[in-house]
């Protein structure tokens, strides 16, 4: 009879006095095996019970922690303004109320400095020091993995590549040379020119070649809906740059946030101008030979405000034009080096024909030529394929619907 419904049946042994020694030995062995099986099952159940007990203890601890958190009063966020002999002056976030208060006994006053973010209770007493606040959007702009673009992937703008490397890479890699010569390196580089000429690729190559951190953003990302958000994002962006130096900051399409100021009274235009003021202030705030280099790019140079173009902010204004015939030939070499090109393809003649083509247009041309070969079931790209691709893009351009239409008289 079992002691408990939850326990296995205890084996019972009845030996007949008339059994022989061999029968008695066999019965004892079978009884022993049943006892071992029952013991093994009890051990497993005990282990399961111990595991369940540990889970329940953990749940109880979590519930106690939640209960304590629910009973704890919420804190307010404030910034330390000044440390005095009478206490600490804080400014509460939200209402900007300034209060003279005290620290909690557990805090060490030597670890607190003006500007620190702190948590205060209902009595305004400082309870704990918080980490520095950085907008998550600014942190997301940091490029963790460098792009794969190299300077060898860029053609037709060798002079521009040299100027960018002088202004961005050399001050980071060899600042002593500038000090010995007695000059300050350019504090910023602005790349301007029509679309598709390699401005963004040049910035990607810098990110790949340099050992510095790389922060990439678009000017439109700084244009925010609510008042002050854009300026705050700019502050956090440059604060992140200061923490990551040496660093290269790349602002693409900067005309979205640095266009000429007007007399417009709309709230949207006013917010864009406030953001630009913060950007101008941050660009002026670094030492000339600091470890922060700024690259910006735009294809609307005519829209930029004069304040952002002055020396001290962007010391080098580098025009990135459409390539000449030698540059087009170099770009064709770059985009066809991995292609299976037939012997009848004359890249020199093709470069002569591609007048007014940008680097992006030439890349599109080589892709179209490859598509014509695939369409015919061939793995080799012939001169006829390039001619067909050229004709196709030219027809698209003339129709006014293609990616290269309207660039002949493009103003920048």
Curated annotation (Swiss-Prot):
Disulphide bonds in the chain: none
Keyword Chaperone tagged: yes
Keywords: ATP-binding, Chaperone, Coiled coil, Cytoplasm, Nucleotide-binding, Proteasome
PROSITE patterns: AAA
Assigned GO CC terms: cytoplasm; proteasome-activating nucleotidase complex
Principal cellular location given in the protein's record: cytoplasm
InterPro entries in UniProt: 26S_Proteasome_ATPase, AAA+_ATPase, AAA_lid_3, ATPase_AAA_core, ATPase_AAA_CS, NA-bd_OB-fold, Nucleotidase_PAN, P-loop_NTPase
BP-aspect Gene Ontology terms: proteasomal protein catabolic process; protein unfolding
Domain of life: Archaea
Pfam families: AAA, AAA_lid_3, Prot_ATP_ID_OB_C
Entry's free-text remark on domains: Consists of three main regions, an N-terminal coiled-coil domain that may assist in substrate recognition, an interdomain involved in PAN hexamerization, and a C-terminal ATPase domain of the AAA type.
Family: Belongs to the AAA ATPase family.
Function: ATPase which is responsible for recognizing, binding, unfolding and translocation of substrate proteins into the archaeal 20S proteasome core particle. Is essential for opening the gate of the 20S proteasome via an interaction with its C-terminus, thereby allowing substrate entry and access to the site of proteolysis. Thus, the C-termini of the proteasomal ATPase function like a 'key in a lock' to induce gate opening and therefore regulate proteolysis.
Protein name, as recorded: Proteasome-activating nucleotidase 2
Organism expressing this protein natively: Haloferax volcanii (strain ATCC 29605 / DSM 3757 / JCM 8879 / NBRC 14742 / NCIMB 2012 / VKM B-1768 / DS2)
Annotated gene: pan2
